[in-house]
């Protein structure tokens, strides 16, 4: 990616990126884990290795009595590799708040019907620990959640969940 998203006023035909750059973002495809949304190898495979292991171990640090975390199903916009990985890094750590417009627009295009079909009442951002948010300057999940809620006409509830413990970053959870 050239790291040059178009401004909202310049967006043409719903495209926030240059055509050449957009081809660098690889779609996830149809064969994904039913729980987390990661690609799976076989067409009939329902769960990825990690989610299968979670079911087998019947352990959950999040929700007692279930092998899964407290969310029902995850979705991904692009494969988390190459350009998408770099773009996410810039969004999180490079103060590229305008990326939220692009990600929210893509989420609405790819999953808007799925989200509204689930009778979702509100979009709730994943909170950051205050110290981490202060260091980073903002919570990218909060910015994205607001844009997505606006795009889908849903309530936005930033105070619905609070992070009171400074946990390890998701990338360190395995």
Q: What are these model-derived regions, one by one?
A:
Residues 1-174:
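Glycine-rich phosphate/pyrophosphate-handling loop used in enzymes and phosphotransfer proteins
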